[in-house]
Amino acid sequence: MRTRAAFVIGVLLAAPVVSGFSRTLIAAQQPQPAPTPRAAAPVDLTGYWISIVTEDWRWRMVTPPKGDYASVPMTPAARKVADGWDPKRDTAAGEACRAYGAGAIMRVPGRIHITWENDTTLRVDTEAGTQTRLFRFGTAAPAGEPSWQGRSLAQWQISGGRRGAPPAGGSLKVVTTGLRAGYLRKNGVPYSANAIVTEYYNRTNEPNGDTWLVVTTVVEDPVYLNGRFVTSSHFKKAADGSAWKPTPCEAS
C-alpha cells in the first residue's frame, strides 16, 4: 500500500511538469510571426550620405547644353522633346522639379538621409530639390496619383550565410512606378509616366573605415528609351547631419 501510494503521489507531482513541457512544445511548434522588414534587414542603410561624383561630371555637376544626349538610348520622340527643352517654361509651369524625380534624383549631387518611417517603410530625404521618397515593403504598391517620386515597392535581397544561420549580408531592391513625366538629365532628356525605375542599394565597408553606398539605377521606358538606361551613383557615409542643407528644385 505504501508503494502504491508513493507511486500515485509521484504521478500527481510530475503532472504539472509534464503539462508545462507539453505547452512549451506546442507553443514551439506554432508558426511564429514573420519579422518586420526593419527587424529582418540584412544591412543597415540608415544615416546621412553624401554623393561622390567620380564620373559623368559634365552631366551631373553642371546643366549640360541642349543637344548633349550622349550615352542615353533615346527614341526619336525623346530627342524631339529634349530639343524643345526650355527651363524658363518649366519654371513658369511649376515644373522645376522635372530633373528631381525618381528616375534621376540619385544622380543629383548632394546629401541624402535614410531613416525608417515605420517598421515597413524606409524613407529617403534628399538635399537636392528637398524631395522625400518612401520605400514600402510588401506585395503591392499603394494606389495614388502620379508624382515625382512615384510609388516604390521594396524588398531585401539576402546573400551569404548557411541554411538556418543569420544572413551574411544583402542589398535592397526598389521598383518605382506611378511617376510624373520627368527628366533623366537637366537638359531635358525625358522619361515618360510609363517609365519603370529599378534600383539596387548596396553598402560596403572599406578597410580604412569608410562606408559606401552604391545605388545602381535602371530606367526602362517604352516611350522615350529604346533600351535600358543604367547608372551607378556613389555615396560616402557622413558622421552626422551637421552639414545638411536642403535646397529647392531648380530648372537649370
PLM features: residue spans?
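Bacterial N-terminal signal peptides
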Residues: V8-S19, R23
